[in-house]
């Protein structure tokens, strides 16, 4: 429990190193006598520090406190106005500052010129192209690095080398930043014109990226990669990441497979010792040489050399270095372009009349047929979701922007807001709500735009469409997704599968007479040529469907959907360019519609089918699998002869020709052994993921607090680490210290301790041990958890005022009335709460809640309030179970081969012992009978929390609940009277507990929890029929064993003799578990 607190204390002495600085630790204890001593200790410390006396004697006098109580926080104050960063930085600024090449990029503003050269006046200035968009500053980042360097200056042996490498790289950053002075941020962590005008425009975001990279350097290779990227990304702000990662699509095709995992009929991964040779035509090597030459032209030296050295024998053993380069390339930061350039990019493609109409026709027909196939059943059976599509849309309406700011009245309060949910309420109140009319998006009402920034790609634009588009599309798209869920071609949506299943799918059919074709179609999705055939295919499908039913409501739903497609065929967008707003006719498909993902998948499937049907005219093969996954599609083709170099080359060229005939600018490749798509790549029969999540730069600003962002930072660090990109953990912890500290006054700051940040309360930010989610069961842990629960939900006056207004109340009751047949308090309250929660995205509300949260937190961190709660958390349950378990040593042999080479050793070891999991454990209750019954008759989707509450009610109440949602009384009676109901009780409890224990997140999602190897380490005598208790005992045992193995690299076995008398008590408790939402769980969810 010590490391974080130790570093924290050292960090504070490092930052506040002057005479006037004082650190006062604050302790607490669940033992009331010790707690009294904690309070005395604190007040004496304050007294002495006010008099400027030493605290040493107090520490001695209160040894019982410092040794037995738990550290709650550290109060630090310093009267120095501290410009310590600049002072310390000078010591490291020994190198030559970098000079930017001012012609490195095509677009002038992407060159790293002085800000005043790009923006001559403050009025013209915008930080949107370089905003790190994170609630921490460059000076904090510099401090964190210098703190690490100072702590490790005396390291020895291998550690000293790491120190030397990082010191060397930091000299580059320090010298460059020092030359211009450290840019000071404002209260919102933004960099203003006054600060930036005499400094290079991209200085901050470059320095952040460089710090992130240098703190991820361990080996000599890391050092070479980082050095090259740091130096070059100072000048090249546009194409560097793309250049460095472009070889990967070819490299995956060069490694022989010697043993791999394949998906079997049971959808499990099983080892296959097949050998498949990589057959590579010369043309491929020529293409690779060209890529490497381009890299060298851009000034890269070491990275292309590493790739060339690897090419000598293309071994899978050395491939992780290639994977590393591929991951590192993303850490140069986001490419942020001006909106105008982002939009024009898609319109620049030349339109040619010389296209294969026959292929386009086939493409359109395939889209049409797929749309029909997806919706046919629902339409023929007059599905209630299609009948009540408007209500379904309203219930799942988001609180995102509606594209324009409006003045809205809620009771006596007038506010300005752009949020969809508020616009809907306002329109309803003023009789302006007309869901039957889809507003045009033509030249008279052009679409406002959002943006999506990604490292290594151009900025993409996003349509911000009026909410009517969402309502019109929601229900239909949901039906499409349900179809996609049980169609294997749609890798992204396929039922509860994860990426490992898709991996086994590809390797399964690879052999010496098969080749795999993989295409990145992201260009095609957003190209003009796609828009007409794409929308027309959908429209034709909808026309066919409309003739399959006589239900007016269903026909109306389809009609409105069709109208959205017609409107979007003539779309204009508005782009601010300086002070003018340009209107541009935009003839391509952009994200922003509800259908974006589903429709793109349909189109990409149609595209690859069209291409394959052409290829089939020339070659004889069997298509073993076709998959689409986001912007990528791939297919495995099996020939009746062995594949030769010539064949690979011919097929490859024919495929490219075929795409060219549709004027589709796509990157199509053919290989015999591996593929590379955006989400994952397969090489040498093993699976890799790109570890490219930026830590110190964010894509955009949201309304999350510093605490939320600290949790996201940690979560990103964990995901990167699982994927093979490791950042120094001490550095991450230092960032967490900085980001979770709370300023009380200018000179007074409060730093929470590890206990506060790692206990699963509403304030949890990280785990004290990577990959292990601990649920504290000691008295002090439960005590602090209770204390935090007492102040968890904060009120907001603005939100209350809005919620009390007639506008809001009428909206909520309109939804309830449309949804419910009879009164149902649970659902009505649920809707009201959901709608109220949506108000959080309105900035004044979230600010108000944040202030309340912080002031409550300040009180709590100085003295935790005892709080007797009747709420039970998962910790209480585990606290009750723990004493009955007896541990003994055990032994599990390694029995599975590695298939994910980038995993950290301790995680890899567990998978090799107990096996991996290719499915998501159901944690939302959607598979339960009650959930299915509700969705059969109603558009309402209860959350797992609600199902958990409902299923534990009396049978009479459950029946009323069901009937009120429109379920026929006979069905409700049958349900409550049947066995299914008692199975459901168990099933929903199981889902709920899985949900609470984050079993589908972090590294737990990789482990096979039902592994027989794991089961045999657990002995629990079976007593009586309480499956829920048996379940929780087993699950607890599994987590204990796995956590122990992650930590120690060895196995234990557990024996539990749980008294029968306690079982029923535990069972009752299990129906009152409260779920805790924290920045930590939100960050996990955000990863999803």
From Swiss-Prot:
**PROSITE patterns from the entry?**
RDRP_DSRNA_REO (PS50523)
Recorded GO cellular component terms are: virion component
Cellular localization per UniProt = Virion
Gene3D superfamilies attached to this UniProt entry = 1.10.357.80, 1.20.120.1390, 3.30.230.140, 3.30.70.2480, Viral RNA-directed RNA polymerase, 4-helical domain
List required co-factors: Mg(2+)
Provide one Gene Ontology biological process annotation. DNA-templated transcription
**Keyword field contains DNA repair:** no
Query: Which reaction is recorded as catalysed by this protein?
Result: RNA(n) + a ribonucleoside 5'-triphosphate = RNA(n+1) + diphosphate
Q: What class of enzyme is it?
A: transferase
Keywords associated with the record: Magnesium, Nucleotide-binding, Nucleotidyltransferase, RNA-binding, RNA-directed RNA polymerase, Transferase, Viral RNA replication, Virion
Q: How does it assemble?
A: Interacts with VP3 (Potential). Interacts with VP2; this interaction activates VP1. Interacts with NSP5; this interaction is probably necessary for the formation of functional virus factories. Interacts with NSP2; this interaction is weak.
The record's function comment reads:
RNA-directed RNA polymerase that is involved in both transcription and genome replication. Together with VP3 capping enzyme, forms an enzyme complex positioned near the channels situated at each of the five-fold vertices of the core. Following infection, the outermost layer of the virus is lost, leaving a double-layered particle (DLP) made up of the core and VP6 shell. VP1 then catalyzes the transcription of fully conservative plus-strand genomic RNAs that are extruded through the DLP's channels into the cytoplasm where they function as mRNAs for translation of viral proteins.
Which family does the entry's similarity section mention?
Answer: Belongs to the reoviridae RNA-directed RNA polymerase family.
Protein's name in the database: RNA-directed RNA polymerase
């Amino acid at each position: 429990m010590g490391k974080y607190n130790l570093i924290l204390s050292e960090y504070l002495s490092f930052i506040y190193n002057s005479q006037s600085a004082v650190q006062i630790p604050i302790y607490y204890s669940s033992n009331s006598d010790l707690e009294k001593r904690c309070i005395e200790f604190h007040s004496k410390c304050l007294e002495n520090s006010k008099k400027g006396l030493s605290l040493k004697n107090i520490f001695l006098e209160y040894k019982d406190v410092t040794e037995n109580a738990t550290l709650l926080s550290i109060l630090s104050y310093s009267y120095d106005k501290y410009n310590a960063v600049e002072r310390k930085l000078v010591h490291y600024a020994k190198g030559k500052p970098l000079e930017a090449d001012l012609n490195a990029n095509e677009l002038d503003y992407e060159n790293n010129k002085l800000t005043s050269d790009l923006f001559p006046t403050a009025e013209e200035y915008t930080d949107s192209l370089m905003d790190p968009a994170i609630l921490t500053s460059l000076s904090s980042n510099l401090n964190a690095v210098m703190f690490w360097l100072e702590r490790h200056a005396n390291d020895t042996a291998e550690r000293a080398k790491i120190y030397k490498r990082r010191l060397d790289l930091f000299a580059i950053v320090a010298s460059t930043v020092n030359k211009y002075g450290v840019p000071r941020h404002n209260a919102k962590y933004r960099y203003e014109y006054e600060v930036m005008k005499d400094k290079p425009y991209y200085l901050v975001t470059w320095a952040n990226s460089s710090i992130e990279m240098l703190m991820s350097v361990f080996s000599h290779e890391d050092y070479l990669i980082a050095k090259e990227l740091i130096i070059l990304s100072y000048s090249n702000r546009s194409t560097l990441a793309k250049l460095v990662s472009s070889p990967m699509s070819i490299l995956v095709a060069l490694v022989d497979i010697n043993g791999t995992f394949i998906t079997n009929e049971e959808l499990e991964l099983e080892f296959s010792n097949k050998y498949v040779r990589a057959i590579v035509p010369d043309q491929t090597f020529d293409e690779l040489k060209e890529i490497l030459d381009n890299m060298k032209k851009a000034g890269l030296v070491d990275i292309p050399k590493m790739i060339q050295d690897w090419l000598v024998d293309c071994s899978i053993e050395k491939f992780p270095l290639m994977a590393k380069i591929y991951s590192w390339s993303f850490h140069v930061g986001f490419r942020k372009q001006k909106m105008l350039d982002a939009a024009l990019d898609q319109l620049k493609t030349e339109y040619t009349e010389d296209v294969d109409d026959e292929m386009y026709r086939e493409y359109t027909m395939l889209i049409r047929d797929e749309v029909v196939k997806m919706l046919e059943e629902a339409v023929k059976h007059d599905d209630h979701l299609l009948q009540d599509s408007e209500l379904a849309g309203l219930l799942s309406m988001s609180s995102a922007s509606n594209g324009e700011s409006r003045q809205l009245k809620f009771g006596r309060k007038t506010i300005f807001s752009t949020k969809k949910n508020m616009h809907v309420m306002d329109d309803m109140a003023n009789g302006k709500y007309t869901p039957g009319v889809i507003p045009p998006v033509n030249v008279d009402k052009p679409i406002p735009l959002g943006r999506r920034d990604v490292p290594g790609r151009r900025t993409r634009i996003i349509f911000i469409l009026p909410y009517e588009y969402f309502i019109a599309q929601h229900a239909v798209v949901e039906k499409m997704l349900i179809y996609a869920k049980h169609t294997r071609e749609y890798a992204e949506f396929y039922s509860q599968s994860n990426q490992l299943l898709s991996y086994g799918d590809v390797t399964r059919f690879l052999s010496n007479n098969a080749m795999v074709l993989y295409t990145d179609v992201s260009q095609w999705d957003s190209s003009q040529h796609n828009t007409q055939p794409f929308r027309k295919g959908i429209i034709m499908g909808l026309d066919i469907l409309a003739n399959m039913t006589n239900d007016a409501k269903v026909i109306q739903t389809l009609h409105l959907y069709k109208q959205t497609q017609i409107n979007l065929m003539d779309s204009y967008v508005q782009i601010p360019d300086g002070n003018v707003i340009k209107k541009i006719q935009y003839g391509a498909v952009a994200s922003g519609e509800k259908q974006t993902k589903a429709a793109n998948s349909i189109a990409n499937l149609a595209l690859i089918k069209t291409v394959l049907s052409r290829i089939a005219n020339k070659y004889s093969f069997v298509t073993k699998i076709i998959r689409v996954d986001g912007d990528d599609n791939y297919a495995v083709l099996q020939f009746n002869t062995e594949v030769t170099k010539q064949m690979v080359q011919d097929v490859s060229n024919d495929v490219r020709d075929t795409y060219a005939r549709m004027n589709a600018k796509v990157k199509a490749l053919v290989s015999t052994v591996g593929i590379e798509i955006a989400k994952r790549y397969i090489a040498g029969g093993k699976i890799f993921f790109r570890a490219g999540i930026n830590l110190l730069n964010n894509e955009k600003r949201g309304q999350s607090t510093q605490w939320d962002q600290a949790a996201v930072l940690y979560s990103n660090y964990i995901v990167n680490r699982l994927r093979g990109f490791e950042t120094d953990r001490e550095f991450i912890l230092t960032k967490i210290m900085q980001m979770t500290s709370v300023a009380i006054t200018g000179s007074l700051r409060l730093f929470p301790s590890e206990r506060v940040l790692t206990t699963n309360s509403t304030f949890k930010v990280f785990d004290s041990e990577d990959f292990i989610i601990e649920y504290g069961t000691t008295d002090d842990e439960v005590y602090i958890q209770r204390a935090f629960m007492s102040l968890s939900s904060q009120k907001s006056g603005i939100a209350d005022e809005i919620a009390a207004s007639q506008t809001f109340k009428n909206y909520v009751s309109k939804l309830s009335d449309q949804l419910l047949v009879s009164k149902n308090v649970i659902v009505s309250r649920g809707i009201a709460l959901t709608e109220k929660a949506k108000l959080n995205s309105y900035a004044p509300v979230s600010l108000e809640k944040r202030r309340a949260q912080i002031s409550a937190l300040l009180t709590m961190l100085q003295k935790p309030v005892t709080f007797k709660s009747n709420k039970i958390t998962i910790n209480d349950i585990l606290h009750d179970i723990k004493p009955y378990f007896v541990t003994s040593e055990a032994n599990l042999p390694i029995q599975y081969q590695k298939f994910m080479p980038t995993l950290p050793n301790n995680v890899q070891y567990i998978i090799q012992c107990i096996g991996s999991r290719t499915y998501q454990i159901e944690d939302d209750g959607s598979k339960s009978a009650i959930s299915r019954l509700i969705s059969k008759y109603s558009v309402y989707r209860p959350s797992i929390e609600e199902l958990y509450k409902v299923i534990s009610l009396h049978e009479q109440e459950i029946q009323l609940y069901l009937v009120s949602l429109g379920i026929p009384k006979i069905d409700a009676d049958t349900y409550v009277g049947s066995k299914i109901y008692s199975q459901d009780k168990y099933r929903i409890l199981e889902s709920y507990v899985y949900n609470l224990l984050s079993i589908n997140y972090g590294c737990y999602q990789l482990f096979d929890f039902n592994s027989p190897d794991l089961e045999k380490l657990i002995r629990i005598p079976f007593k009586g029929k309480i499956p829920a208790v048996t379940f929780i005992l087993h699950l607890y045992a599994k987590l204990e064993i796995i956590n122990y193995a992650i930590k120690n690299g060895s196995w234990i076995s557990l024996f539990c003799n749980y008294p029968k008398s306690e079982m029923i008590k535990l069972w009752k408790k299990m129906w009152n578990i409260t779920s805790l939402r924290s920045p930590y769980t939100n960050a996990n969810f955000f990863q999803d």
